[in-house]
Amino acid sequence: MKFDQKIPDKFLDLKLDEVFGNEKRRVLLAASTHPDEEKLIAGIFLKLVKEFPDLKFVEVPRHAERGSDVADIFNDMKLPFHQRSRGGKPSSPVSCLLADTTGEMVSFINESDIVIVGKSFAGNNEGQNVIEPALMGKAVIVGPQLKNFRHVMDIMLKKNALISVGDDELENSIRDLLKNPGKCKDQGAVAKATVFEHIGATQRTIDIVKQV
C-alpha cells in the first residue's frame, strides 16, 4: 500500500540558477539524511566533482533544524555551499546547496538526476520512502537495509528498480551513473514503471475486503 502516493502537478521554482549558475548541470540529491550520512556523501561529492565538473550537490537533512550542524560539517570539509535557510543567494555560484528548509523535497527531487535516500547509510538502516523519487523517474540509490520499508525494497530490488549498496560502494555507484547517462536514465525509467505497476494496491485491497 505504500506505493500509493501522488506527485503534485506543479513544482516550486527553486531558482537553482541563482545558486549553481545557469550552465548545464547534473544534480545529485541526498534526501532526508541523518547524522554521519552528510559527511559520507559530501566527501564522495568532493571527489566526483573533480571528474564531473557539471555535477551539483543538494543536501536535504531529514530534520531542518540540523542545518547548522550540517553547515559546520561542510565548513570543516572546506566544501563551499549556500545555506538555503539563510535566504538570499551566494555572491558567486557554488556547487553545493544545503537545503535546510521544509516543504520543498518533491521539488528538489524534480530537479535531480540521482537521488540518494537517507537513513540507510553510515550506520543508519531504517530507511526512508523511496517511492517519490522512483515515481518521478529518478535513479535511486539506497543502503543495503531499509527495515521500515522492507516489503517495498524487496519488490523494487527484484525489478532492478533500486540500486542498493553499502557505504564503500556508494562512490562507484554514483560514478557509474555519471559516466553512463543512458544507464542513469534507464534506471529511472525502470523505477517509475515498477511503482506504476503497483499503484492501486490500496483500492484493490478495499475491493477485496468488500467482497468478503
Outline where the language-model segments fall.
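Nucleotide-activated sugar donor-binding and catalytic core shared by glycosyltransferases
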Residues: 1-212
